Amino acid sequence: MRKFTAFACGTGAGLAAYYLQKLRDPQLAVHNSWTNSDRPISECALWDSNWDFRDPKSLVRPQKNDLPQEQNRYNSDLEKHVAKSARHIILIRHGEYLDVGDSDDTHHLTDRGRLQAKYTGQRLRELGIKWDKVIASNMVRAQETADIILNQIDYDKAKLKHCSYLREGAPIPPQPPVGHWKPEASQFFRDGARIEAAFRRYFHRALPEQEKESYTLIVGHGNVIRYFVCRALQFPAEAWLRISINHASITWLTISPSGNVSIKYLGDTGFMPAKYLTHRIPRDAKNVV
């Protein structure tokens, strides 16, 4: 009888331990939603606060010891590198254009594309923003879009900056891949480095000496803007082709002094009449993407 009791107790304890272990198995745990998990679901969910390499702690010499003078030195150096204001980066995709000819010089906006750009300029004017910088890709369709927008907003055309880094291209092989658009590996190699360089040039927290919020307007291209959005929000960059943005749409990203990034608008064209909404090259043009 004692042997049977001991056997029963041992078996019961073993089953209880097994059951408790199974309950702890994260693959079997059930939450009301993913947000109830006490751990990030994927590594991509972890935010890199030093993504722009401007986190103050990464810019000063580490504290050597706990002596008061060393603490004062460290805190003083840290304070000199702390950003005080937010940066707003507003990205505009060019208007609809015709892909006619083999040269960028022939890729002009359509009449509808010009109207799209005008509506966008009017919308930006209504927002009442005081622009600190306006930058445009040096491709014809972006230059024409920027020129039309500048006719609508309060900004000196002579101050417009032209940037070859913002030219359209193939930033990174997309996931999932698509059958209708397959650039050569050499194009990703070439364009990817340039577009990433553009991201690093324009996306970073404010300098410590910037005392008030700044507004930068960038007129560019669909692929580049979508890549910028993924990089800025620390989404997988390969996801850029999952996003669709209309011609002359507004995308608004804000970089806070802490380095956190938020998105206010993504491809906004709600201010345009529906008949002017487009996102592809017209059907009568070649090389439709």
Curated annotation (Swiss-Prot):
Enzyme nomenclature, EC number: 3.1.3.16
Residues that span the membrane, as ranges: 7-23
Subcellular location: Mitochondrion outer membrane
Highest taxon of the lineage: Eukaryota
Catalytic activity from the UniProt record: O-phospho-L-seryl-[protein] + H2O = L-seryl-[protein] + phosphate; O-phospho-L-threonyl-[protein] + H2O = L-threonyl-[protein] + phosphate
Record-linked InterPro entries: His_Pase_superF_clade-1, His_PPase_superfam, Mito_Ser/Thr_phosphatase
Listed GO biological process terms: positive regulation of mitochondrial fission; positive regulation of mitochondrial fusion; protein dephosphorylation; response to anesthetic; response to heat
Membrane-related topology note: Single-pass membrane protein
Ranges in a coiled coil: none
Enzyme class label: hydrolase
GO molecular function, one term: protein serine/threonine kinase activator activity
Main location: mitochondrion
Keywords (A to Z) from UniProt: Hydrolase, Membrane, Mitochondrion, Mitochondrion outer membrane, Transmembrane, Transmembrane helix
GO cellular component, one term: mitochondrial outer membrane
Subunit field text: Interacts with Pk92B/ASK1.
Family: Belongs to the phosphoglycerate mutase family. BPG-dependent PGAM subfamily.
Function: Displays phosphatase activity for serine/threonine residues, and dephosphorylates and activates Pk92B kinase. Has apparently no phosphoglycerate mutase activity.
UniProt-recorded name of the protein: Serine/threonine-protein phosphatase Pgam5, mitochondrial
Species name: Drosophila virilis (Fruit fly)
Gene behind this protein: Pgam5
